Each structure stands twice: as structure tokens, then as C-alpha cells.
């Protein structure tokens, strides 16, 4: 049985001693973004970012013992979520560069590896976009809109993933009596993979439930391959699951568009149509059936801009049809996508509002083969080994910049940002 978490009800709990905010206050790096309209052009927003709560130190109140261990919550400190909230405090982060994150104006650099005390560490940061108030996540509503950003993937070798995507998290990060920190400290993460994490909406997950929500992968990529993929789920908001039901709540594989996997093997890469040795712009459009911001999502369209030239998405053949975008006919044969609501369900989430996540990571278990090896990309079966990446590419990183969204046709080509 799928269980929907009643997030708002948590605010009605008695005012027990909550997981407290520690003495080190959070300092959010500023990251300028832009909102674009047909009438006013692209206008600057004074937004910022926050690292996922998993990067924050959560420890025993009055001591230095972590509230989590390598296997999850410390049962002595966290036998239940109420006791855990009384026993634990979360500390802020004041220097994001120590976690591989640097911002400057409207650009953000994410590093996989950093040097600390002559040792290499892999913080593998994941950050979320905060609204201008710095307390809540920025909720993007993108039906009949477009989302655009510039990216430099030249330092992302095989096996790396510089990802930018949306998930249907709560705007407050699940702020409640037991989680006063909320979005300002990066709580509330969820996605369509339904992982079991130590915390759910900033509260101790002593029941070891899985947590699911709708996910729209705008960009999963390195210098050799890329994909964009909607992942619908069969309900709205945050979903709790247990056991086998965690495999049926969301479309974990999704309906993806990877040019290489679909036969366009000279389209994306070094000196190809989209040249990954140089920065470029990625545009994703969410077209609705009635061309309104409340209509049913019918198509997810992709294009690129590089060196002043607009580049249409790769044109490929699928089941005898010529396609270059994600539509219901394209997704009809892709697993459980339609059964879980397909583009309609994904569009409903985009209409309600989703949170922007950006990350860099590699894959010790599968070497990121699903993205860039075999039928999915040109990388060998061993190039994605994280130990090889660390030795050969210690400066691996991705830069996202000039993030903007708004009316169709307003975010790219000759539009000025101001």
C-alpha cells in the first residue's frame, strides 16, 4: 500500500522540543537567476542555493557525536523521530567551497574532488535553488514555458554526471515542529528512485520507509553523452513506500531521450554538432495541448545554442517514426511510463511547481554505464570507475550559469539578461 505523507499536518503537532538549529548559522551562496517574459525580457532574481541536508553536520545536542552512522540513524539518539528531534541539532555551513561549491554572479561551479589537509575528498555536492527570501525553495511552474541554462561539461569525463533536474519537493523542505530548519538547511529531498534515507522531510526515518516524488531530469550529462528524462509517479506530492511497492510507485527508468542511444552518434561530443569542448546553452520547452500554462503537457522539446547558432535537437528514427522530442507516442513503448500517468502526470507536477536541483556525482556500483557506455554512449566499460576518474581527472567539475525560465522563445538567442 502506498502511503501519502500528510506534510501540512505536521505543523499541528504539539510543540515538543524539535531537532534544533545549531550555533553555526547557514550562509547561502548567492546565485543570480532570471525570470523572462515576452513583455519585459529577462529580469534578475536575487536567489541563492543551499546544500542538501545530508552535507550538514547533524549531531547530539551539547556534544560531537553524529546522529547518523554508516548504516543510518544512531538508534541510541534516534529511537523514534520525536526523541531524535530532542537529541539532535543541525549545523549550518559557512564555506561552501569546502563542499565543492563556488558561485560568482549567475554562475556556479560544482567540483567532484577537493583537497583538504593534503587529502583528496569527494563531497559530490547536490544543491537546491532557494527563493529570494532564503527560507524556502524556489518553485518553478513550467507548463507552456521554457527553462534555459548555460553549461560547461568539458571537465566531465566518462563516468561523471553533472545533473540539473526538478523534483516535487515541498517548498518549505518539510518545515515542521520536528524540523524547524526546513529548506534553509536543505531538507526535504525526494525523487522518483524512491530511496530509503535516514531523514524524511528533516525528520528521523525510523520506519525505514522509501520516499518517492515526481522527477523531471532536464540534464544528466558529461562530455560524451547526455539524456533528458521525465519520471512520473502515480500520485502527487511526497509518497511513502515499503518493500516491493517502492518499485511500482514511480517510473524509475523514465522515458528518456539520449541522442547516442537513439542512433545520433555524431551529434554530441568533441567537435560534433554540439561541441562539448566549449560552453553551450540548453533550452527545454514544455508545450501544452491548448498552448496555456494550465493545459495538459503534450511535448518536451529540446534545442541548443552554441556560438550564436540555434541547434535543433537530434533527429532520430524510433519504431519507424522520425522524432526529435519526447511525446506520448514516443514514450508508448517505454516500460511503465504510460501506466503511471505519462506526460499528463508529469505536466501536473510541473504545473504545481517543482524544485531545481543541481549536482555532480559518479557511480561506484555501475560506472554510469546507463548514461555513457554500451548502447548509451562511447565510453568503455572501465572508464567510469571512480578510482580511475580521481587519479586521471582530479579537477573534474561542471559549471552551470545564466539559469533562466519563462515564456516560450524569451530565454535564448538574442534575448538580453538585465
From Swiss-Prot:
It is found in: Secreted. InterPro entries: ConA-like_dom_sf, Glyco_hydro_7, Glyco_hydro_7_sf. Keywords: Carbohydrate metabolism, Cellulose degradation, Glycoprotein, Glycosidase, Hydrolase, Polysaccharide degradation, Secreted, Signal. Glycans are attached at residues 46, 118, 136, 234, 291. It is an enzyme of class 3 (hydrolase). GO terms for molecular function: cellulase activity. It catalyses: Endohydrolysis of (1->4)-beta-D-glucosidic linkages in cellulose, lichenin and cereal beta-D-glucans. One of its GO terms (cellular component) is extracellular region. The active site is at 215 (nucleophile), 220 (proton donor). Residues 1-18 form the signal peptide. Disulfide bonds: none annotated. Its EC number is 3.2.1.4. Belongs to the glycosyl hydrolase 7 (cellulase C) family. This is Probable endo-beta-1,4-glucanase celB. It comes from Aspergillus clavatus (strain ATCC 1007 / CBS 513.65 / DSM 816 / NCTC 3887 / NRRL 1 / QM 1276 / 107).
